Amino acid sequence: MTAPAIEVRDASLAFRLSRSRAGTFKEAAIQMVKRQITYEKLWALKGVSLEVADGEVLAVIGPNGAGKSTLMKMLARVLPPTEGRVVVRGTVAPMIELGAGFSMELTAYENIVMYGTLLGRQPEFMRERTAEIAHWANLDEFIDVPLRSYSSGMLARLGFSVATDTEPDVLIVDEVLSVGDAAFQQKSAERMKNMIDEGASVVLVSHNLATVLEIADRAIWLDQGLVKLEGDPEDVVAAYQASVG
């Protein structure tokens, strides 16, 4: 039996929050030196378990603050779980924040080489791919422009183009495609489908429930850090829609 591309077992993630009531920086410093500051845990995710098979698309839906982005960062190996186990097999290309992994002071060309290298590709290979990556993103004329001059849509196109061009085993997409226009969203969906046909796994966060129904094999509904429902996308989306009226 083939091991799943992603395996999460009873994973929880907590952030540590200070309960200091210091009114000034000096008071806070004194409390820190005297170890008078107490902390509490804020659980962003609690007891999450899931699997994603090779070539499967898992959609994650839920209200703002449900823990969706935290889950994506945990799967992308950005945030380790506080408790439980997370295993992601193979190469991972995360698109979890607009512009993440890019330097705004560097040009698109320089960022493509750097980003691809971070994802495991050789620099020389990425240099050979820069023109094609920029062309797919409709950024041919802007390849030598620093990213600080890019719009959010241009950043999204560049990020998706370079991430998918590296042919990852797992693609993690957290709503960043929503900033693109309809043509780009359709183009991105087609490329994702091609990747899936070739065996890549995708975890997708989206508030566009029509997209979820169109491309997802399974869906989970997150609410307050808990998996409220998992299963067929139609069932999960219907239950979520009923809950929000």
Per-region residue spans from a language model:
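Pre-NBD coupling/linker segments of ABC/ABC-like ATPases
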Residues: 2-44, 233-245
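Conserved ABC ATPase "signature" region
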Residues: 26-34, 113, 125-142, 161
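The feature captures the beta-strand-to-loop junction immediately N-terminal to the Walker
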Residues: 61-63
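H-loop/switch region of ABC-family ATPase nucleotide-binding domains
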Residues: 206-207
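A short, surface-exposed alpha-helical micro-motif characterized by mixed small hydrophobic
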Residues: 212-214
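Conserved ABC ATPase "signature" C-loop
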Residues: 224-225, 240
